[in-house]
């Protein structure tokens, strides 16, 4: 009697990559839900791109097992015609998932553009618009993933940002209600929390999961023309 496992039995034991991707992502999202205050609202920043679309879908699925109040929030940058497409996709997804959606229109000040540059001004304006939705104790979820983490570290290194710039993005941090950075004397109950549930998940797994669900670029998520 041979003790060697057959090829068929080995195949049965191997979890398909798509299932592994789904399992890892769902575990990450459920952990983020458990870390969020059950009495408060979880806001998911929905840009309309692949990563935020999948984060919203995963959260809508996971919330059935870990009840939380979910809301989506989309920031319209008003910088290019494609921003209208992003907003329309966000509205369709919110309707499909049965989740409320808030849309914020961003107006970047000319002084901010000149002093900070377009990318930095848009990033800071977006975070301010998102955090303005929050009440104390709420959570704001961003869809940054493992590849974003690596890219951030590389860009900061190339810019010579120093020790602070080389620090990794934290999976979560305090966020002052209204968008200001929380001061040391600010009491905990006046803060919200920013979480990045997918920070440990590589982008290829997110894409694999989207394809497994039959989603398509241009139809179920928008590709950023500036990338």
Question: Could you tell me what each predicted segment is?
Answer:
Residues 2-227:
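Core alpha/beta nucleotide-donor-binding catalytic domains of modification enzymes
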């Amino acid at each position: 009697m041979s003790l060697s496992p057959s090829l068929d039995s080995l195949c049965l034991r191997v979890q398909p990559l798509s299932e592994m991707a789904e399992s890892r992502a769902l575990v990450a999202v459920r952990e983020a839900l458990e870390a969020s205050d059950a009495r408060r609202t979880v806001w998911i920043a929905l840009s309309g791109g692949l990563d935020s679309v999948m984060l919203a879908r995963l959260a809508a699925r996971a919330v059935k097992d870990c009840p939380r109040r979910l809301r989506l929030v989309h920031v319209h940058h008003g910088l290019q015609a494609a921003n209208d497409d992003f907003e329309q996709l966000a509205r369709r997804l919110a309707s499909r998932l049965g989740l409320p959606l808030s849309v914020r229109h961003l107006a970047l000040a000319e002084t901010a553009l000149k002093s900070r540059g377009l990318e930095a001004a848009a990033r800071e304006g977006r975070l301010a618009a998102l955090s303005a939705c929050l009440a104390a104790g709420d959570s704001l979820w961003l869809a940054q993933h493992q590849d974003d983490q690596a890219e951030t570290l590389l860009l900061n290194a190339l810019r010579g940002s120093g020790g602070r710039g080389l620090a990794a993005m934290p999976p979560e941090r305090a966020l002052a209600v209204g968008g200001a950075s929380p001061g040391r004397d600010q009491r905990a109950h006046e803060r919200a929390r920013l979480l990045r549930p997918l920070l440990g998940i590589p982008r290829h797994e997110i894409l694999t999961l989207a394809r497994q669900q039959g989603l398509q670029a241009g139809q179920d998520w928008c590709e950023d023309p500036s990338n």
